[in-house]
Amino acid sequence: MILYKSEQRVLGRSDCLQILSQAEKDHPDAFERARDYFVAFVDPAAYYKPYPTVAEINAVNSAFTEWVLFDFDFAQATAAERAGEPLPEAPQTLVEAYAQGDATVEELARTQFFSTFWVIAQDPKRKLSVMRETRTCRDFEVSCDLISTRRNWTSGTVNARIASVGGRWVSCGRCLSHDSAPSEPQPACMTQTDPERESSRFIELVRELEGVNGRFVATARAESFWPA
């Protein structure tokens, strides 16, 4: 495990709430379109229950927050409001649009991705885990209190969003889920291949976990949290 001399700032709850609040104020129509798309695509099972639990509603809200911050193409959604202005060459997420020159947020927005990992090793004292991405077999040393302390997560796989902040990989998403189905880790790959960012990967998993017709909705034990 690597020791770091000082903590790097992580995009926290207050940062995210500030971005969401400002975006909704600046672009209410685009924000509403994002919400409508998310609800139509996921079709949350909680919305069909007469008395959903607070945890069920929080799970839906947490998933929407993570998706709209990190995966939703905000530039395309606001194109009509900026008639005559050229669109960015690549999709621009909400967190990228509102980084506002903050180097930490810009780095996080540029490097973040959501994927599936094997948890290879845990160090609870340092809140660090070695996580092997299942598609590239690349190892990441990730700072996350929750992942480092869940001993049973060394079996099966974990779905998480991570990003590099100041050269250190951190858990940056609001939603984590653990799949307990047996899965044997593949050998680590020595090449530093960057996992391909797929903006649909997160929302598709949310539909399976929380959607009314989701494959795992009956047995899902998803957790949502904000990094400290």
Where are these regions (language model features)?
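Mixed-charge, low-complexity intrinsically disordered regions
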Residues: M1-D123, C137, L146-A228
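Short aromatic-glycine-enriched beta-strand elements
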Residues: K125-M131
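Extended, charged helical/alpha-beta scaffold domains that provide interaction surfaces
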Residues: D139-E141
